[in-house]
Amino acid sequence: MRHYEIVFIVHPDQSEQVPAMIERYKSLVTSQGGQVHRVEDWGRRQMAYMIQKLAKAHYVCVNIECGKETLAELEHAFKFNDAVLRHLIVQTKKAETAPSPMMKEVQREEARKAAQTTTEGQAA
């Protein structure tokens, strides 16, 4: 089995459906003997360019280990899900379990926002 990193972009109106989508894709991989090593929900982010007249979308990154048949089925599921605007599948040499640089940035932003709200609350 090979290791893959998958990033998919979900329509912003479907953001509340993302946890269910992640579970569906995880169960698809595990039911066929694969493994899910890392799941990162990067949240709503500004896109580099507009897709379908949208400037923001919900980003998700998943690292998996699976066979070619499972990967083909997963790609088929992405193509026929209208909520998925784009997807990218990259083969990796080994399983990635540490937080990605993007996830570290998301965590920094959340920590900064939390610190900002506490300082505003103390000032009031």
Curated annotation (Swiss-Prot):
Entry's Gene Ontology molecular function annotations: small ribosomal subunit rRNA binding; structural constituent of ribosome
A Gene Ontology term for the protein's cellular component: cytosolic small ribosomal subunit
Any Pfam family matching the protein: Ribosomal_S6
Region annotation (Disordered) ranges: 96-124
Polar residues biased stretches: 115-124
Keywords linked to the UniProt accession: Ribonucleoprotein, Ribosomal protein, RNA-binding, rRNA-binding
Role played: Binds together with bS18 to 16S ribosomal RNA.
Membership in a protein family: Belongs to the bacterial ribosomal protein bS6 family.
Protein name (database record): Small ribosomal subunit protein bS6
Lineage, opening ranks: Bacteria, Pseudomonadati, Pseudomonadota, Betaproteobacteria, Burkholderiales
Gene giving rise to this polypeptide: rpsF
